Amino acid sequence: KLYLMSQIDHSLSLASPVPRNFNAVQRIGLASVGAGLALLTVAIFGAAAAREGSFFWGAITLISLGGIAFSWSTYMQEAAGIKNNGVMFFSETARGALGWVFGVIITTFYILLYFYPAELGYSADGNTGLVALFDPLSYLLKGTPASQWFMYGTFYTLSILILGFKYILKYRHSRYHIIRTSSVMFFQTAFAFLIPEFMARLNQTAELKEAGMTVPYYDFKNVWPLNYYNFEGYRIDTMTDPTFNSLTNNLGFIMLLVGVGSVFFLSPLLTYFFGKRWYCSWVCGCGGLAETAGDPFRHLSDKSLKAWRIERWLIHSVLVFIVIMTIASVYAYLRDNGADYWINADVFVGMVATTLLGLTIALWTRRKLFATVQTDIKVVASILMVAITGLTVYTHLFGENGLVFFAQPYKIYSLYAFLIGAVFSGVIGVGFYPLMGSRVWCRFGCPMAAILGLQQRFFSRFRITTNGGQCISCGNCSTYCEMGIDVRAYAQRGQNIVRASCVGCGVCAAVCPRGVLSLENGPNTDNSRMDEVRF
């Protein structure tokens, strides 16, 4: 007697890995999104009709309404609660063929965006192709033709809004996730997209045109070192120019004040009270895209010890790189223009030396605070800080021919902009979502995350508390940690979690079936934190 074993399901899972058939609303939603993408594809090949405003608004409307309809029908037909059914089996979310194809498409788009914008249709003599499709919206907001960056900003914002709506429906039972997602949607739309474009419209005023000045792009929520370009000489010249400020109601001084104040006051203060989550999960555009568009891929983050070691050294290497680049840029500017400011090159070198040597001394004398930092890390950090200090002083005393750190400052800046600002944060950071998870850039390369992580690690009240007695070791928390933290290992020991890499997204607590984890603020004393900290 023959048995067809392939027809017998031996699984005890209540959730079938085989995707269900889509209902009518879902099919209509997918068809609408497909039609919108088809219009974008037509625009890529330079169809004349693509330059019509109706073509652009039609594509955006079809994609938006289709995404909303599909999300609503997917999540609102069932009871509230996180459902990741089949995510480990679907080809697009399990590093299958569709996942690789999706990754290649995104990576190719970013390569064209950063290095070959003409292939997307951007031209100073008149846009064509895909970029030309966005001219109507660009004229509406700032009165000039679209650039590849305007096109990208529109795509980026639209993705966060549509998929943020989907995320809210999925996590609608969690007040924390609703508010957090609404926050990143607001900051991306208002601060990263609309306000900079409205500011760019000032460039069309007769006064600024007559003065030959332009308002530099400025995203008020971007904080150094994420906006590594903010303290470049040309921007400082514009922000401190009396004529520019008189024509823009002191906009330049406001931008400079926000840029400096956010680095030295706002960011450390908020990180002390709330941890790095205030920025990485509530404000940052990179984090916003990772939490919304990247949500289906969060389980792909590598949880291995090897990945953690690479992460630790790589992200802090990027931080060292941008510190060197910023010191070189600011010093070169003050060396040539220091007479115009109370902070001249002498004062700046003194500030750098005092800060870095002070941190080096504290690393070895504040034993309770830095007790869990391994000796090899202390040694490497000390050598780097002393070396940077020595090179800065040497450059100031003996440097010649405009060199800083034995190189032209603009070359250091260009190298960072290419390797980190373009390749790492863009091409790899987003293009590898379907392969390495949604926080590749945030975990391995973002210098802002590195600085906030160090503050969170040693000086913040934020931690994830655990009730180990309730843990059943299901592993959901570790599986869906997009930063690759083995949360379960802490929960099993009943050990509170204070990790430099944790962005406080709260998904580990949301997927826990026993309520073991809780995001809290606690006392910040050396003795109370030592038993709960793991670097």
Range-by-range predicted roles:
Residues 1-495, 500, 515-535:
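Non-ligating segments of multi-cofactor redox enzymes
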